[in-house]
Every structure is written in structure tokens, then in C-alpha cells.
């Protein structure tokens, strides 16, 4: 809990492929672990090793998942997406985040041999919507750089490991 006069920790919506492929699950776990330094990760289940390649199961089915994710997206202060593994869902989430005016960081690994969609790379404006190329070994450094440079007012009270 933030002390009086401090801002509450950041709420982070993390996007990563679920039904589009789980090849990057271990990387997602590293990303979510690092994001926890900066606040509450609303979608940490994306990094869960138990989440099957066929995707999430919920009592309410796909419609429940859609509504829950949109609610979390509206609550989020920032959106972080790992976009190397192509995913229709991640693209949809990013479009909705843009419409909501959320700050967005997309992370892409060119070494994967994939080419990032022009609809993602072309949306980058150098401010509200960022697309950063990175190597897997530097993901934590990239996240630290983003949160310290672009969201310092939100992370000042939550950048220590116990947050």
C-alpha cells in the first residue's frame, strides 16, 4: 500500500501470445517477473507455464475472457506487449489500447527471423506507442529503461523489489 502522499503502484497489462503459440512462455515469465517491480500485472496468467497452447479456459468461455481482458485493459496504466510470436489477440489488444489512449511498449526480437507487422511497427510514434527491438538476454534492461524513462511518475514509489 502506498504511504500518504505517494502514488499507488502502476497497473500493467501484459500482452503475449496464448492461442497463437506458447513458444515464448518462459520469456513471458521473465517479463512478468520484471514488470512486478513496477506494479500490479493484471494479466500475469499469460506467463503461466500451465496455460495450454489451446489457450485459456474460463467458466464463461471466450466471451467472458474477452470482457475480463477489456476490463483489465481499461484499468491499466500502461500496456507492455511481447510481439515476436504473431498473435491475433495481441494485435486486437493493442488496437484497443491505442483507442483508450494507453501508453504502449511493444518488444520485438529480430533475431527470431520473423518480420514484425507493419500495423504494429508503423503505429510507433516515439512517445505514446513505442516499438523496441531487443535480444532475449536484454529484456529486463529494456523494461527498466522504459519504466524509468517514460513512466517515472508512476514508478517512483514502486521501483524497489519489495513492491
Swiss-Prot record:
GO terms for biological process: allantoin metabolic process; deoxyribonucleoside monophosphate catabolic process; dGMP catabolic process; epithelial cell differentiation; nucleoside salvage; positive regulation of cell growth. It catalyses: 5-hydroxymethyl-dUMP + H2O = 5-hydroxymethyluracil + 2-deoxy-D-ribose 5-phosphate. Transmembrane segments: none annotated. 5-hydroxymethyl-dUMP binds at residues 16, 18-20, 87, 89, 93, 117. It comes from the Eukaryota. GO terms for molecular function: 5-hydroxymethyl-dUMP N-hydrolase activity; identical protein binding; protein homodimerization activity. This is 5-hydroxymethyl-dUMP N-hydrolase. It comes from Rattus norvegicus (Rat). The lineage of its organism: Eukaryota, Metazoa, Chordata, Craniata, Vertebrata. The gene is Dnph1.
